[in-house]
């Protein structure tokens, strides 16, 4: 009987079993060892190993032919650890922002062209904006999204805009030129503003959180029912967000050049 199985879930499960086996062995394994340990035909195991090798999940020693875990998995692990670190680091600073402004704070990153809320903090007042962890928001018309887009190449921003653009309110930017000009301002001043572009009457501010490499990996922001973006209240909130984002960046190893 053939072991051929076109079910993608089953294929992933088989690949995961092999990765677990190599990890637990704590040494490179041969094709024969892997096939015997998993109870699968060598041809099936070889196909899975070849696929995983092509994407860097496993590496094959040119001299011995044995397989070991690839660098790509280390990169994924580092990314996960980085996210865990920033969530721990940002918890108290976000609470402090909420206490000082009585508005909602959120930490986010870019996920397939949209803003993904990683963590949030909300005031105790009855009237506040809810920022749900795990929720996706448009990137081109939110303060946090514009901060994240501002660090991307123009071609990447254009693709995201063309894929996701729509008019959420009368204030939403519906042309790429308008967005591009706004992102230029974001880079120059070091923060982004949201002025009723996603939800009428809702305003926000966000600043970039840099990693040790100098890239903008996260955005930290406040969102609420600020009366005006030119008010003393909003200017004070902006200064707090920028200061807090800078402190988080430094905690992640970033240093201003």
Language model region names:
Residues 8-12, 31, 66, 70, ...:
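Short, structured helix-loop boundary elements
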Residues 111-145, 172-207:
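Intrinsically disordered, acidic Ser/Thr/Pro-rich low-complexity regulatory segments
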Residues 1-88, 246-254:
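N-terminal helix-turn-helix
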Residues 56, 117-119, 218:
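A structural microfeature
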Residues 63-163:
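Amphipathic alpha-helical effector-binding/dimerization core
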């Amino acid at each position: 009987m053939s072991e051929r199985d076109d079910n993608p879930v089953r294929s992933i499960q088989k690949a995961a079993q092999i990765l677990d086996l190599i990890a637990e062995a704590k040494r490179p394994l041969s094709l024969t060892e892997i096939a015997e340990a998993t109870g699968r035909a060598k041809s099936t195991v070889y196909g899975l190993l070849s696929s995983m090798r092509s994407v860097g999940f496993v590496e094959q020693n040119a001299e011995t032919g044995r397989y070991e875990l690839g660098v790509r998995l280390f990169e994924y692990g580092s990314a996960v650890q980085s996210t865990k670190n920033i969530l721990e680091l940002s918890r108290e600073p976000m609470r402090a922002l909420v206490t000082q402004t009585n508005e909602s704070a959120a930490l986010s990153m870019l996920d397939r062209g949209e803003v993904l809320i990683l963590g949030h903090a909300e005031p105790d007042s009855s009237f506040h904006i809810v920022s749900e962890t795990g929720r996706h928001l448009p990137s081109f018309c939110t303060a946090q999204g514009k901060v994240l887009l501002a660090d991307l190449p123009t071609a990447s921003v254009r693709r995201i805009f063309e894929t996701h653009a729509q008019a959420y309110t009368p204030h939403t930017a519906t042309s790429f030129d308008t967005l591009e000009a706004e992102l230029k301002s974001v880079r120059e001043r070091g923060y982004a503003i949201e002025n009723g572009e996603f939800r009428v009457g809702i305003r926000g501010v966000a600043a970039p959180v840099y990693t040790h490499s100098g890239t903008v990996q996260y955005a930290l922001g406040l969102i609420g029912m600020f009366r005006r973006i030119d008010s003393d209240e909003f200017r004070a909130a902006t200064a707090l967000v920028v200061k807090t984002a800078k402190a988080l960046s430094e905690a992640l190893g970033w240093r201003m050049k």
